[in-house]
Amino acid sequence: MKKVLVINSSVSQLNNSDSLAMSNMFIEEYKKMNPNDEIINLDLNETKMSQKTLTRNNIAEYFNQEDSFDFIEQLKSVDKIVLNFSMVNWGIPAILKNYIDHITIANLTFTYKGSTDGNAIGLLSNIQDVQILATKGGTGTPNSAFTEYVKNIWEFLGAKVKSEIIINEMMDIPPYAEQSPIENLEKVKEQILKAAKNF
């Protein structure tokens, strides 16, 4: 039995989130293939930690048991991650950045000890795959920089990102702007179902 951590970092309302709809479809299909796996849900909108931004005024107490170490222990206990988010001002949501800052800690999730080439050694090698599900605006906005950043972070921490990144785009222009998240899934439905079966 595998443990799958599903991280929701969409800042849209639950009934209006395209990236959350992607995640829900993915997990629904995944559970059909893996009914005995444990699914753990983490909504960053509902955690105190993800509301805290690192500053010079709070750095002394920023990394603590409740906000950092408990979440790191969770990461070390799971086998796979499904992460959904949308592009916000050409970047990732602040709650996801705050989460990343809280769990990226030397000698806990990465280390330089034992490195022979000066590169960090990731300590989250237990994570066999990270599935990234993202949404963005029209084709005029950058397509991959925001997802590549997230991919690079997980790989830096030792996790494997074997699954293809799935991006559902053009959510803010007609006809997609008038459609429900479920309707907007049609463009990437086959990608999602295939990825879930191979995850």
From Swiss-Prot:
Q: Which Gene3D superfamilies match?
A: 3.40.50.360
Coiled-coil intervals, chain numbering: none
Q: Which InterPro entries does this chain map to?
A: Flavodoxin_fold (IPR003680), Flavoprotein-like_sf (IPR029039), FMN-dep_NADH:Q_OxRdtase_AzoR1 (IPR050104), NADH:quinone_OxRdtase_FMN_depd (IPR023048)
Catalyses: 2 a quinone + NADH + H(+) = 2 a 1,4-benzosemiquinone + NAD(+); N,N-dimethyl-1,4-phenylenediamine + anthranilate + 2 NAD(+) = 2-(4-dimethylaminophenyl)diazenylbenzoate + 2 NADH + 2 H(+)
Which keywords does UniProt give here?
Answer: Flavoprotein, FMN, NAD, Oxidoreductase
Q: Work out whether the entry's keyword set contains NAD.
A: yes
Name what cofactor the protein needs. Answer: FMN
Q: What's an example of a GO molecular-function annotation for this chain? A: FMN binding
- The entry's FMN-binding residues are 10, 17-19, 135-138
Q: EC number(s) on record?
A: 1.6.5.-, 1.7.1.17
Give the note describing cofactor binding and stoichiometry.
Binds 1 FMN per subunit.
What HAMAP family does the annotation carry? Answer: Azoreductase_type1
What this chain does, per the record?
A: Quinone reductase that provides resistance to thiol-specific stress caused by electrophilic quinones. Also exhibits azoreductase activity. Catalyzes the reductive cleavage of the azo bond in aromatic azo compounds to the corresponding amines.
The record's family statement is: Belongs to the azoreductase type 1 family.
Quaternary structure, per UniProt, is: Homodimer.
Query: What is this protein's record name?
Result: FMN-dependent NADH:quinone oxidoreductase 2
Naturally occurring in which organism (per UniProt): Mesoplasma florum (strain ATCC 33453 / NBRC 100688 / NCTC 11704 / L1) (Acholeplasma florum)
- Organismal lineage: Bacteria, Bacillati, Mycoplasmatota, Mollicutes, Entomoplasmatales
